[in-house]
Amino acid sequence: AVKEVKVKVDTDKKTIPMLGIGTSLSFLIMMFNLPAPGGTSAHAVGAVLIAILLGPWASCLAVSVALAMQALLFGDGGILAFGANAFCMAVVMPFVGYAVYKLLNKWTKNRIIASFFGGYIGIVAAALTVAVLLGIQPILFKDSSGNPLYNPYPLRVTLPVMGLTHLLIGLVEGFFTAGVQEFIERLNIDNTQELTTKKLRPLLLFILALIILTPL
């Protein structure tokens, strides 16, 4: 991911501020958690939006940095779970969502619809990956009595709980992704080279509002 982003930065220096904005957005919106059954939580990520704007490898790097900051500064997600969280939200989500976006954009010629379903399907795919990782733990990790050491819930519980919860939270992710995509379209921006501070002012104000509203 770092190598791919370095090539992109060498080609276009304006990728750096966009990458910073994307990382900030991802960090902030992930702070708004909704409780889900079984001690888990659901939240938007922004990974597909970053993938659409800068590419999936850039999204992988940005979301990984955001997750690391959350784990180290706030204990959110946990350091020991960083690898699993990064795999689900910084690898599965941006690459699946970006693939859906590209496919639908080719079929429909409508980037707003494509970005909505890219964000929606991307976060559902990430949630189902989490469900599988949690659901196989009772099989893999047991004590001498056969009791689960960590997560006690099997796949028949984790899959529907995480899946159904994120079918709802996925709407937030989809609308967020499509909304920012529409914002960029209305500015008649075809690529990141045309992004200026003046044009991005509403987005920067949105980030400031998220900072103020972020629960600490």
Explain the meaning of each model-derived region.
Residues 1-50:
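Hydrophobic transmembrane alpha-helices
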Residues 10-12, 37, 108, 148-155:
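Helix-boundary and loop/linker segments of multi-pass membrane transporters
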Residues 1-4, 10-11, 16-17, 154-213:
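Alpha-helical transmembrane segments and their cytosolic interface
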Residues 26-29, 93, 97, 122-130, ...:
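Alpha-helical transmembrane segments of multipass membrane proteins
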Residues 16-21, 60-64, 87, 113-117, ...:
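Hydrophobic alpha-helical transmembrane segments
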Residues 89-131:
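Short helix-perturbing small/polar motifs within transmembrane alpha-helices
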Residues 30-97:
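Alpha-helical membrane segments and adjacent membrane-interface helices in multi-pass membrane proteins
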Residues 132-145:
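Membrane-helix interface motif
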